[in-house]
């Protein structure tokens, strides 16, 4: 019989007071989009004239049509799909922000429900599932919203809408 010393199996010590001892390996969070809604076919928005290019008598109706178009939600996880329409919606949102900032009396009783509908379609959404149960703001990166280019403009529009009256 050999009397070679045997080493005990390795045992990791667990510090019950430190969350680091229980923490899983960290993975980098990728961008996610809470606005993904499966669409079978590419989204087509009908190009509309600019608000400044139509007579003032036609602007309220065109404003409502543009608000309705901005209710369309795109899949920002697929960066190559609907590029033209995503850009069109972004420019329309910019135009709407400028329009309610500059124009006096453009918001009528008829426009309020459409404004609320457009804002709610874009802002109220299901958040993406969390990658882990724990979130440490000091060490973890926040989940990035892929649709932020449109969301930022919707928030800006909503702020201008609230300030306009």
UniProtKB/Swiss-Prot annotation:
<keyword id="KW-0597">Phosphoprotein</keyword>
<feature type="modified residue" description="Phosphothreonine">
    <location>
        <position position="7"/>
    </location>
</feature>
<keyword id="KW-0007">Acetylation</keyword>
<comment type="subunit">
    <text>PP2A consists of a common heterodimeric core enzyme, composed of a 36 kDa catalytic subunit (subunit C) and a 65 kDa constant regulatory subunit (PR65 or subunit A), that associates with a variety of regulatory subunits. Proteins that associate with the core dimer include three families of regulatory subunits B (the R2/B/PR55/B55, R3/B''/PR72/PR130/PR59 and R5/B'/B56 families), the 48 kDa variable regulatory subunit, viral proteins, and cell signaling molecules. Interacts with SGO1. Found in a complex with at least ARL2, PPP2CB; PPP2R1A, PPP2R2A, PPP2R5E and TBCD.</text>
</comment>
<dbReference type="Pfam" id="PF01603">
    <property type="entry name" value="B56"/>
</dbReference>
<protein>
    <recommendedName>
        <fullName>Serine/threonine-protein phosphatase 2A 56 kDa regulatory subunit epsilon isoform</fullName>
    </recommendedName>
</protein>
<feature type="compositionally biased region" description="Basic residues">
    <location>
        <begin position="20"/>
        <end position="29"/>
    </location>
</feature>
<dbReference type="GO" id="GO:0072542">
    <property type="term" value="F:protein phosphatase activator activity"/>
</dbReference>
<dbReference type="GO" id="GO:0007165">
    <property type="term" value="P:signal transduction"/>
</dbReference>
<dbReference type="InterPro" id="IPR016024">
    <property type="entry name" value="ARM-type_fold"/>
</dbReference>
<feature type="compositionally biased region" description="Low complexity">
    <location>
        <begin position="30"/>
        <end position="41"/>
    </location>
</feature>
<comment type="function">
    <text>The B regulatory subunit might modulate substrate selectivity and catalytic activity, and might also direct the localization of the catalytic enzyme to a particular subcellular compartment.</text>
</comment>
<comment type="similarity">
    <text>Belongs to the phosphatase 2A regulatory subunit B56 family.</text>
</comment>
<keyword id="KW-0963">Cytoplasm</keyword>
<feature type="modified residue" description="N-acetylserine">
    <location>
        <position position="2"/>
    </location>
</feature>
<dbReference type="GO" id="GO:0000159">
    <property type="term" value="C:protein phosphatase type 2A complex"/>
</dbReference>
<dbReference type="GO" id="GO:0005829">
    <property type="term" value="C:cytosol"/>
</dbReference>
<dbReference type="InterPro" id="IPR002554">
    <property type="entry name" value="PP2A_B56"/>
</dbReference>
<feature type="modified residue" description="Phosphoserine">
    <location>
        <position position="32"/>
    </location>
</feature>
<feature type="modified residue" description="Phosphoserine">
    <location>
        <position position="34"/>
    </location>
</feature>
<feature type="modified residue" description="Phosphoserine">
    <location>
        <position position="30"/>
    </location>
</feature>
<feature type="region of interest" description="Disordered">
    <location>
        <begin position="1"/>
        <end position="41"/>
    </location>
</feature>
<dbReference type="GO" id="GO:0005634">
    <property type="term" value="C:nucleus"/>
</dbReference>
<dbReference type="InterPro" id="IPR011989">
    <property type="entry name" value="ARM-like"/>
</dbReference>
